[in-house]
């Protein structure tokens, strides 16, 4: 009985000293995937998280962030041509066409300016036929006049006479070029209409001219000059 007890005790001691298979960092399941090729590893082939063949995060074949096949940010082929687009050419101001502005000097007319558009005046010609003819054809007559600065004339009559002649001439030439002709009645009515418009233009220009002159006299007076010098 004593011999049997000693043999059983020895077997139990040997069992406690034997290593258990499949522990941490042994031939069993391991993490991370290093060591025995037969182990159950995750990831399976030594790459980073989500990398079948190695590379950065989310990169099937290597490259920068979010790049399936390499290259810079947001570029499939690695060339930086997304940020170097040529700027659009600026519009050439010489190619912008426009009508002559009111008050601007008209080229080719020797310093004449084009006045602002006016409403054609209501004129009575003394008989029903001409009155009716004017009402029906007034849209064919000018609503702007050509003129020179008032300081180039001695009086209103000279200004108006020159204004009427150049305006009717220019309007007739322009309209005839378009294939429309004027009768004697048209010319008579245009003279009356344009004359009234030239008188209105003279009054506007004279008022503006004298206002500019008054301002110059005011600012050139000695008290005002002294006051401005003191303020400066």
Swiss-Prot record:
Please give the name of this protein. Answer: Major prion protein
Pathology linked to this chain's protein:
PrP is found in high quantity in the brain of humans and animals infected with the degenerative neurological diseases kuru, Creutzfeldt-Jakob disease (CJD), Gerstmann-Straussler syndrome (GSS), scrapie, bovine spongiform encephalopathy (BSE), transmissible mink encephalopathy (TME), etc.
MF (Gene Ontology): copper ion binding
Q: Which UniProt keywords apply?
A: Amyloid, Cell membrane, Copper, Disulfide bond, Glycoprotein, Golgi apparatus, GPI-anchor, Lipoprotein, Membrane, Metal-binding, Prion, Repeat, Signal, Zinc
Q: What is the lineage of its organism?
A: Eukaryota, Metazoa, Chordata, Craniata, Vertebrata
Annotated membrane topology = Lipid-anchor; GPI-anchor
Chain segments carrying region Interaction with GRB2, ERI3 and SYN1: 16-214
Residues at which Cu(2+) 3 binds: 61-63
Gly residues compositional bias: what residue ranges? Answer: 45-79
Residue ranges of region Disordered? Answer: 17-90
Name where it's found: Cell membrane; Golgi apparatus
Q: Which residues form the propeptide?
A: 215-232
Binding residues for Cu(2+) 1: 46-47
Q: Any domain commentary?
A: The normal, monomeric form has a mainly alpha-helical structure. The disease-associated, protease-resistant form forms amyloid fibrils containing a cross-beta spine, formed by a steric zipper of superposed beta-strands. Disease mutations may favor intermolecular contacts via short beta strands, and may thereby trigger oligomerization. Contains an N-terminal region composed of octamer repeats. At low copper concentrations, the sidechains of His residues from three or four repeats contribute to the binding of a single copper ion. Alternatively, a copper ion can be bound by interaction with the sidechain and backbone amide nitrogen of a single His residue. The observed copper binding stoichiometry suggests that two repeat regions cooperate to stabilize the binding of a single copper ion. At higher copper concentrations, each octamer can bind one copper ion by interactions with the His sidechain and Gly backbone atoms.
Q: Where does Cu(2+) 4 bind?
A: 69-71
A single Pfam family it belongs to is Prion_octapep
Start-end of the sequence repeats? 44-51, 52-59, 60-67, 68-75
Q: Which residues are recorded as binding Cu(2+) 2? A: 53-55
Give the positions annotated as glycosylation sites: 165, 181
Family to which the UniProt record says this protein belongs: Belongs to the prion family.
Q: Does the keyword Iron-sulfur apply?
A: no
SUPFAM superfamilies named in the record: Prion-like
């Amino acid at each position: 009985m004593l011999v049997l007890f000693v043999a059983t005790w020895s077997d139990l001691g040997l069992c406690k000293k034997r290593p258990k298979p499949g522990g941490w960092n042994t031939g069993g399941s391991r993490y991370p995937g290093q060591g025995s090729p037969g182990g159950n590893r995750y990831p399976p082939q030594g790459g980073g998280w989500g990398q079948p063949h190695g590379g950065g995060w989310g990169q099937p074949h290597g490259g920068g962030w979010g790049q399936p096949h390499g290259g810079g940010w947001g570029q499939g082929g690695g060339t930086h041509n997304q940020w170097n687009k040529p700027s659009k050419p600026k519009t050439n101001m010489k190619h912008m066409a426009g009508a002559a502005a009111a008050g601007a000097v008209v080229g080719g007319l020797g310093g004449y300016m084009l006045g602002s558009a006016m409403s054609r005046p209501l004129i009575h010609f003394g008989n029903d036929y001409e009155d009716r003819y004017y009402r029906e054809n007034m849209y064919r007559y000018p609503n702007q006049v050509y003129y020179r600065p008032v300081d180039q004339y001695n009086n209103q009559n000279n200004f108006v006479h020159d204004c009427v002649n150049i305006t009717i001439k220019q309007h007739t030439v322009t309209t005839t070029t378009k294939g429309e002709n004027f009768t004697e009645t048209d010319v008579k009515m245009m003279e009356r209409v344009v004359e009234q418009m030239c008188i209105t233009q003279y009054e506007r220009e004279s008022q503006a001219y004298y206002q500019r002159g008054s301002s110059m006299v005011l600012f050139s007076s000695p008290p005002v000059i002294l006051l401005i010098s003191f303020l400066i």
